[in-house]
């Protein structure tokens, strides 16, 4: 069986899903949901329940690996939300193309990483 890249596939659905996951991560939705289901939320002695951190998406830095249709659309939507977007240059590149940030620098600066590149032998770490 041969697996191929499908250019232009899910260019709306995948970026929207990525943004949903970013909100879930930054707002600790899994923890909140778990505590609501188990009833822990109702044990709170005050009107609010604060067991998990909530951090703003706006002002966060997103590292995008892959600047094709999907990576570009994720970056565009993230910028609309007020995120700083860094597109990663190839690992071990000797020069950095315009519009890209060195690979290691993206790893250092980004609060969140999203991967939108094919898994090829040259991209394996």
Model-derived regions, located:
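Rossmann-like adenosine-cofactor binding region
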Residues: 90-125
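Short beta->alpha connector loops at strand-helix junctions that form conserved
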Residues: 1-9, 89
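NAD(P)-binding Rossmann-fold cofactor-contacting core
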Residues: 77-97
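N-terminal Rossmann-fold NAD(P) dinucleotide-binding loop
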Residues: 71-72
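Hydrophobic beta-strand scaffold residues
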Residues: 2-3, 85, 100
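Structural signature of beta-strand start/N-cap positions in the alpha/beta core
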Residues: 61-63, 84, 111
């Amino acid at each position: 069986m041969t697996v191929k890249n499908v250019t232009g596939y899910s260019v709306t659905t995948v970026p929207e899903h990525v943004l949903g996951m970013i909100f879930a991560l930054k707002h600790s939705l899994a923890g909140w949901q778990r505590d609501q289901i188990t009833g822990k939320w109702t044990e709170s002695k005050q009107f609010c329940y604060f067991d998990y951190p909530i951090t703003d998406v706006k002002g966060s830095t997103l590292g995008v690996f892959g600047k094709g249709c999907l990576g570009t659309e994720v970056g565009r939507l993230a910028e609309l939300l007020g995120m700083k977007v860094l597109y990663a240059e190839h690992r071990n590149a000797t020069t950095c193309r315009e519009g890209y940030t060195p690979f290691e620098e993206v790893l250092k600066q980004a609060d969140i990483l999203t991967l939108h590149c094919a898994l090829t032998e040259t991209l394996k770490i």
